[in-house]
Amino acid sequence: MRTDDPDALAFRPAEPSDLSQVADLFLASRTAASEAMPPVTRPWDVVRGHIEAWDLGVREVWLAEDAMGLVGFATLTGSWLESLYVAPERQGMGIGTALLELAMGLRPDGFGLWVFASNTPARGFYRRHGLIELEHTDGSGNPEREPDVRMAWPGHAPMTYLRNEIDDVDAHLAELLARRFALTAAVQGQKTAAGGTGGHAGRDSERERAIVERMVRHVPGPETDRVAPIMDVVIGESLTAWEDSRQD
């Protein structure tokens, strides 16, 4: 008998023999959500084969079942909730909440997830359960090339989770700044070798403006007037570093 009582659900980790049913539920859910989510970019048989080949030693797949069988699933890899799907005919009955609470119990220190920007029902669901939106992108990093949002549940110690996220971003930022400085230096070398003007005297305001505009388009959120002064400093300091290196 079907029920909307989440206490009637049973949860268990998936076994390889379950993955065919997981693929069925995934395909049904994505089809039913066509107004909120873009279509998958690969043929259904390829998607099915991919799901049926999941390595359950790397990817945790948790099933929600009742007396009628599989009604939902969630997948976790490391500190990421990679997916959470409920059978279309069982949505709105507390199953998604139960799966999300299961994920919270399995990852008490917090986890992140990606959701399409167009999927407003899912974004609202996650916000109601305490998740926060941390990042918006133009979708160039996902197969569908559709704008998406990185959300996070910061766990039972939110400040610790968020500061760890900042530390991770700063580590990547340091690497990117080093690359930016090196590339700026290489460009100045090419300029001067061709008889042009390098350093601060050779700054190209039109190109710098185009860089800022491209960055703002790529990652919606920070406005041009916020990004422009940051890039002015980054470019300026990289040029100063190049000029200083020529005096050594």
Regions found by a protein language model. Name each.
Residues 51-63, 80:
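A short helix-loop-beta-strand connector motif used in the catalytic cores of GNAT acetyltransferases and
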Residues 24-51:
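Conserved GNAT-fold acetyl-CoA-binding loop/helix
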Residues 90, 94-102:
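Conserved acetyl-CoA pyrophosphate-binding loop and the N-cap/start of the following alpha-helix
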Residues 106-118:
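Conserved GNAT acetyl-CoA-binding A-motif
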Residues 63, 69-85:
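Conserved beta-strand in the GNAT
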Residues 97-98, 118-136, 141-145:
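Conserved active-site alpha-helix within GNAT-family acetyltransferase domains
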Residues 10-24, 156:
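A short beta-loop-alpha structural element at the N-terminal edge
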Residues 157-248:
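Domain-level signature for soluble enzymes in the chorismate/prephenate branch of the shikimate pathway
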